[in-house]
Structure formats: structure tokens, C-alpha cells
From Swiss-Prot:
Annotated region (Involved in Mg(2+) ion dislocation from EF-Tu), positions in chain: 80-83
Cellular localisation: Cytoplasm
Protein name: Elongation factor Ts
Cysteine-cysteine disulfides: none
PANTHER family: ELONGATION FACTOR TS (PTHR11741), ELONGATION FACTOR TS, MITOCHONDRIAL (PTHR11741:SF0)
Organism for this UniProt entry: Lactobacillus johnsonii (strain CNCM I-12250 / La1 / NCC 533)
Family: Belongs to the EF-Ts family.
GO MF annotation terms: translation elongation factor activity
């Protein structure tokens, strides 16, 4: 039987990230053959990963990496936020994101076949991480953005990597691109322009907003406040010429009823029309970045800010860890009872 030296154990640990006892056991099992020991640990890791496959991994980090005219963004999940601050986990996120930016895979299957810096495939790296870290570790998603030489990337991560953003801007400097990435991190838009919002989505969001108004009106009724009206429209897509013309006529009728002199109507109507548009584009303001008030200067929208700069937002990606994942609700008392059996 081959002698298992401390140097052999150290080398195997460096190659696989395994613990001391696991590395020593692997070498004993394969009589000191380093390559076989690596494969032994990988097989063992795949078995561990399979056992953890059904677990919910909703914590983790985003990764952002810019490589010349290519930028990558990733979301890597773990089961607990404790693990997401682990040095090995952070290193895996950064290296996987860099590998994806350089390899430009077309889909997840292609991404998993990319070779990491140590020669291991990206997919195997996550299997190995699951085995060595002890939690389900998974690359949930990634996106790539490319730009031309005269465009700028903005890259930003917020709250220690819980949110990651990439922007692509035309006609802007790097600082503007980053500031817009910061805005997107904070305001969580879904699309660039209201034109991209689906009609059914607008209708659904109007229903959500009107439900909130109903809840507010219940509170207002308790203090004898006038109820707020329901929103009829939510997007500029819905504000046709006929809708705007009717709104203008309604404003004129209101001014007439109030006894305002007709000669001053032209000074009043534009402001009231803008208020009508603002009130009836709430879905745009929540979900379309160009319609949102710019967080660096809320006196203007992002669209107005970019127009002043002579810039155009070409694309963006925003990832937030765990969004859309239904997290398991832990019952601590039940867990303790189970352990006491």
C-alpha cells in the first residue's frame, strides 16, 4: 500500500477543495493515485449533490464581469446567506462569471461545458462546491450583453452583491452608465420603454394598484377622508388621442363650473393635462426605466435626463438574488421536535 503523505493530502486538497479527512480517505481508497483520488472525490461529490438536488437554494450572490466589449451577469444560489459570504463561494461566483464573459455560451448547457481556470468544467465546479461547502450550490441564470467601441458599459452591485446590474449606453460616458445602473438597482424596472409593456401585464398591475387604493380608502374612511378614485389607465400606451381629447374637455367643463375666466384657461389646462398623464401612467413609472423619476435628480425622468445628455439606453440586465423563488418556510419548533425524537 502506498504511503499517504501530508504533501499528497495537501496537493489533493488544493486540486479539489476537499477537507483533510476526505482527502486522506480518498487517497487511501485508491492507493495514493492522485488522478483516481480526484475522480473519487468528484464521484462522491456528485452523489452528495444528487441528494441535495431537491433542496431550495434561494440565497447567494450576483456576479458581474466586464471583458472589453462583453459583460456577463450571473446569479449563483446557496441554501443559506451564511454560505454566500464564504470565501470559496465568493471566489466561485467571480470565476464562473469571468468564465462566462470570456466563453460567451449560448445557453446553460453550453455554459456548464466551459473550462474554468483550473481546467474543471463550470458544471463540475458547482458539483464540487456542493460537496465541499455542504449546501446545494447552483448557477441559476446568466446573461450576456455586448457593446460597440463607441458605447459604454455601466456595472454596479448593491448590498454586497444581492443585486447586480449591467447597462449599455450610447452617447454617454462611463460615469453616466454607472449612475444609471445604480438607478436601476434601486428602482427595479422591468423594461426600457413603456412600449415594451404587455397589455395584459398593464391590466394586471392596474388591478394590483386599485386593490391598494381600496385598502387605503378603508383607512381614510375611518378618519372621514374623501376616498381616492380608482385608476382607469396605467400606461401612455392606453392614452390615445381620443382619451386625451376627452380629458381636455373634462378639464374645460371643470374650469367652467368653477367659474374660471375662459381667457386664462390656456394657462391652466397644460398643467392639469400633465397631472392627468402623470396620474394615469403609474405602471410606466414603476416598470419602465425611461418613465421613472431619476434618483439622482427627481425633478426629471430618466428619459429626460438621457435626452439632455444626448444619450440612449440600449440595454440593461438587473438580477436580484432569490427573486421569483418560493422560499421554504422554516418551522423552528417543529425542527427542534424532530431532532428530539
Amino acid at each position: 500500500m502506498a504511503k499517504i503523505t501530508a504533501q499528497l493530502v495537501k496537493e489533493l486538497r488544493e486540486r479539489t477543495g476537499a477537507g483533510v479527512m476526505d482527502a486522506k480517505k480518498a487517497l487511501v481508497e485508491v492507493d495514493g493515485d492522485m488522478d483516481k483520488a480526484v475522480q473519487y472525490l468528484r464521484d462522491k461529490g456528485m452523489a452528495k449533490a444528487a441528494k441535495k438536488a431537491d433542496r431550495v437554494a434561494a440565497e447567494g450572490l450576483t456576479g458581474v464581469y466586464v471583458d472589453g466589449n462583453v459583460a456577463a451577469i450571473t446569479e449563483v444560489n446557496s441554501e443559506t446567506d451564511f454560505v454566500s459570504s464564504n470565501d470559496k463561494f465568493v471566489k466561485l461566483v467571480n470565476e464562473a462569471t469571468k468564465t462566462i464573459a470570456e466563453g460567451k455560451p449560448a445557453d446553460m448547457e453550453a455554459a456548464e461545458e466551459l473550462k474554468m481556470a483550473d481546467g474543471t468544467t463550470l458544471g463540475q465546479s458547482f458539483v464540487d462546491a456542493t460537496a465541499t461547502i455542504g449546501e446545494k450550490i447552483v448557477l441559476r441564470r446568466f446573461a450576456l450583453e455586448e457593446k460597440t467601441d463607441d458605447q459604454e458599459f455601466g456595472a454596479y452591485q448593491h448590498n454586497g452583491g444581492q443585486i447586480g446590474v449591467i447597462t449599455v449606453l450610447e452617447g454617454a460616458d462611463a460615469a453616466t452608465a454607472k449612475h444609471l445602473a445604480m438607478h436601476i438597482a434601486a428602482m427595479s424596472p422591468k423594461v426600457i420603454s413603456p412600449d415594451e409593456l404587455d397589455d395584459e401585464f398593464i391590466t394586471d398591475q392596474l388591478a394590483v394598484m386599485n386593490h391598494k387604493i381600496d385598502q387605503d380608502n378603508e383607512s381614510r374612511a375611518l378618519v372621514n377622508k374623501k376616498p381616492l378614485p380608482h385608476l382607469v389607465y396605467g400606461s401612455e400606451k392606453q392614452l390615445s388621442d381620443d382619451v386625451l381629447a376627452k380629458a381636455k374637455e373634462d378639464i374645460k367643463a371643470e374650469l367652467k363650473e368653477e367659474g374660471k375666466p375662459e381667457k386664462i384657461w390656456d394657462k391652466i389646462i397644460p398643467g392639469k393635462m400633465q397631472r392627468f398623464i402623470d396620474d394615469n401612467t403609474q405602471v410606466d413609472k414603476q416598470f419602465a426605466v425611461l418613465s421613472q423619476n431619476y434618483i439622482m435628480d427627481d425633478s426629471k425622468t430618466v428619459g429626460e435626463f438621457l435626452k439632455e445628455k444626448g444619450a440612449k439606453l440600449v440595454a440593461f440586465q438587473r438580477y436580484e438574488v432569490g427573486e421569483g423563488i418560493e422560499k421554504k418556510q422554516e418551522d423552528f419548533a417543529a425542527e427542534v421536535r424532530e431532532q428530539m425524537k
